[in-house]
Amino acid sequence: KDFVIFHPSAQYNYKIYPQHSRHELLVHLSDLDIGVVITGSNNQIDTAIKNKLPALSNVFDLIGETTLEEYFALSELSLAYIGMDTLNMHIAAAQNKRIFAIFGPTNLRMWSPWSNQLQKSATEDMPIQNYGNITIFQANIPCVACGNAGCDNEHGKSECLDHISPQMVFNEVKNWYTNVRL
């Protein structure tokens, strides 16, 4: 069965989509006729996310279950990457996967995924940015992209992630998947 990867974590808490938004997005994704494989490592951040995942149909939790090599293979087999600004996003970009990336305070011009198709990365900060096979979501508030490690610049919460609607992310994924199935 076809599947997408949902990678809800990142190395730092200030880059992680809030739990309520993550859950809402997963509920929407589980309603699509496609498998959703949740990935992550076995570190403290990912384990905390794993312990709070909702039980949903079509959703398969592999957090802490794959090596990096196995993740590369899993990513290669997937149709798309949905998730945070992290190494896994860049792996998917290198594999020419369809990407739906959620960014917090990170500077897109420096850290956005590379589109092999267009031979470029993001060139400006925008709430929704499409280029090649990549869609990036980032809040439309004055402080974005501050580049700080959270609003306190000490690895705390990034309020900008609360401004990215799970419904908006889902709508982009649904539109893409509807066209893939045609």
Predicted regions and their residues:
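Donor-binding and catalytic core of enzymes assembling or modifying cell-surface/extracellular glycoconjugates
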Residues: A10, Q19-R109, S115
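A short, flexible beta-alpha/helix-coil linker loop
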Residues: A10-N13, D152-N153
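Short, solvent-exposed loop/turn segments at secondary-structure boundaries
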Residues: I16-Q19, E159
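A generic structural signal for short coil/turn motifs at secondary-structure boundaries
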Residues: N13-I16, C146
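Nucleotide-sugar donor-binding patch of glycosyltransferase catalytic domains
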Residues: D61-L62, A93-L182
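Nucleotide-sugar donor-binding and catalytic loop/hinge architecture
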Residues: K1-V4
